[in-house]
Amino acid sequence: MHTCKSLLLTLFIVQFVYSTEKIRFKSPDSVLIKQTLDSLLSDKNLMALHYEILNYNDEFKEITYQPLYVSYDVDTVIINSNENIKQSYLKHVAKNFSDIKIDRKSNKNIEKKKKTIINKYYFIRSTPDINVFKYQREKLGLHVDINSTFNNYFSALFGGTKAQKDRWEYNGEIDAHFENVWGAMEKLIFKWIAIDSINQKFNFELHRPHLIKGGMGLILNSNYELVNNDYVQKKYDLKVELLNSFYGSFYAGYTQGSINATYNGKERGFISSNYKALAFMFNNNSLDDMILPIKGSKTNFELEIGEDSNFKNLYIKYRQDFERYFPITKNINSCFKFYAEYINAFNNDVGKAREVLFGGVNSLRGYDNNLFRSPYVSIPTFEFHYNGIKSFNSLVFFECGFSKNYKPKLSYGFGVKKITNNALINIEYAIPHTAPINEAKVHIKWLTRL
């Protein structure tokens, strides 16, 4: 009983002195002192924290300890991945931790580093396990376990409709997505979309988190688009990563493009032009999953400042994509999405060919693809998801499109998404607000996982 009272009294004193960062003991009980200090060290979980004797009286009836914070350099960082990534690229991942010191702020700094690599690397969606270890007596190292998730898939859909008596219109889509094919953490995307024979789009993207020597990130984009047989637009983008931290990644680069109006397009007021611009991008990604996210957010902001052969002054263009997932209950979560795009030529009309096209599965569901055209558009979306069944997601959504040339466009609908080891199936049924139910659009996407 006496021991319990002493321990409770000591804990009370420790708790009181803890706020002042000094600890006083009333007796030279070495076992009690060791247990108390070990407990405090365990609670704070700081390797850099030690306790040293500050003072004591002649009879050892009052002993005072004070915290001592030291600083250690990390000599070695070991990165372990569950996927096959080349060591030369894992070394670049390790560099994210090279400036860490084991000191008073090490726990906070390690948490920031965890957020940094989740933001930078699209294939890391869960928090890495990080442990500090000792080797060769006095040297310290970090062991980082990353859970890499790469998605490789391919889909191809084709169809046809008889537009006239002896003429058929074809449509289709090819979507090829490859990740870490060469063990370099790269991402390759190829898309072909044909709404009909006079509306087609080809797109190629290459994402490299690191180049072999310099280690900087790179994004390359090439785009070809035929729009209603009025004009052909070609566009090329190159962006390099300038800065990466726990709050986001910053890119800068160059954009160049051209618009070639057809004879039919010129008759309808479309004008050929060439343009070039400086491009800037900010990206942040904390989603817990790239296919079926439940929590986290994703932000992408792009800005162009450049010149066009049809404009006397500079033009500015920006695009913003944002999505945030909020868990409501264990199996239900809400999602808010926001898409906006804007172009403005100072003291000039931007022209129809440079306006923003929107409508369809990726921008205002329930309407035909690229049905609308405007200098700016913003589309907020609210979704509610049910994910009580593993690898299965159902949703209802409401979205509205705001633009300069049209009244607000509303749509609503529901959908299901199913993931198996071999495929991903996504079906959405979307209805424009003013349309009867039989004019709804069914958006179907089938991906074969490789």
Question: Where does each model-flagged region fall?
Answer:
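Periplasmic polypeptide-binding modules associated with outer-membrane biogenesis and secretion
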Residues: T20-K162, I174-D175, I189-H207, I316-D321, ...
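C-terminal transmembrane beta-barrel domains of outer membrane proteins
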Residues: S27, V93-F97, S297-L450
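N-terminal secretory signal peptides that target proteins for export/translocation
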Residues: M1-H2
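Gram-negative/organellar outer-membrane beta-barrel architecture
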Residues: R104-N300, V356-V361, N370-Y376, F392-S394, ...
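Hydrophobic pocket-lining residues within nucleotide cofactor-binding pockets
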Residues: Y72, V181, L211, I343, ...
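Sec/Tat signal peptide C-region and signal peptidase I cleavage site
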Residues: F16-Y18
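A generic short alpha-helical patch detector that favors 3-5-residue windows
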Residues: S81-I85, F270, P293, G415
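Sec-dependent N-terminal signal peptides
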Residues: S6-V14
